[in-house]
Structures are given as structure tokens and as C-alpha cells.
Amino acid sequence: TIISGQKEVITEKKLGGQIANFKYGSKNIKTFKSNDFMNECGVSINKFISFYKFKPDSIYVIHDDLDLQLGKVKIKFSGSSGGHNGLKSIDSMIGKDYFRIRIGINHPGSKELVNKHVLSNFKKQELITVNEICERISTNLSMLMHRDKSKFLNKVKQ
């Protein structure tokens, strides 16, 4: 996971999800993983950012993307949900002005296979690839803190 490489992580269950708190350099970081179904996660994410008074433009949502090759990473600010039900839910609750870190999981080939594909576990080699990406994201958080998108992507894509 993104937080597994961090030291002194304090976790708690609150606001409909799991919150992890840790220091990254001089910054206090909070991560949130909703306990809701993907298509309803916007409700708990809205509770989280409202409770801590975060502005949406300080939020980074990390999500899977069928339209990207496995392990490919893209980052963007704002925009459409691209058909992703989790993003649709978030958009409906907090608007579209937040960062999205998209991690490719490959498209299964036909629309009929999409639900099964996104709900199934990764195969062994796929899991290794995704874990490597998460580790590189964790290692390079400082670039996100400084909004250095290009440098972040270069490091994460290695």
C-alpha cells in the first residue's frame, strides 16, 4: 500500500473509513480509505474532507483505470470520471477539482467482462507490478507535496 513504507503510522476507523496519519518530512499526512462500496465512496470521502476542513484541490484520489496498460500511471487535476463509478460518486459530493492518480489495470477486452475484472484479485505478476507502483508513489510523495507532477511521474514510471 501507499503507507506501508512510512514510519510511525497511526491508524483509526472513523467517518466511514480507515484513516492513516503519518509525518512525511515536516508535513502531516492523512490518507483515507472508504469502507463504502466504490459507487458510494463519495459520501464518506466528503465526510472526511469536511471533518478535517480540507479543500478538494488538496486531495489526491488514487484509483484503477481500465483504459491504461497495467502499471502505467497518470496524474491529472479535475476532469471527467471517465465512466469510473467511484469518481462519479466523489464528483457528486465534492465536485471535480481534485487530483487523480490513475493506475492502469488493463481492459479485459469486452464490456461484459469489466465487472468481473475490476472485482477480481490481481494475478501474482500483476500484484507485483501494482505493489511496485505503490511503493514508488510512497517513496516520491514529496514531489506531490510540491505539486511537481512531471518529476513525480518520471520517478513513479521507472
Predicted region positions:
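Nucleotide and nucleotide-moiety/phosphate-recognizing core
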Residues: 1-77, 88-99, 109-113, 128-158
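Short glycine-enriched, charge-decorated loop/helix-capping segments at active-site entrances
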Residues: 74-80, 118-122
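Short, conserved glycine- and acidic-residue-centered signature motifs
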Residues: 83
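Active-site oxyanion-binding pockets that recognize sulfate/phosphate
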Residues: 123-127
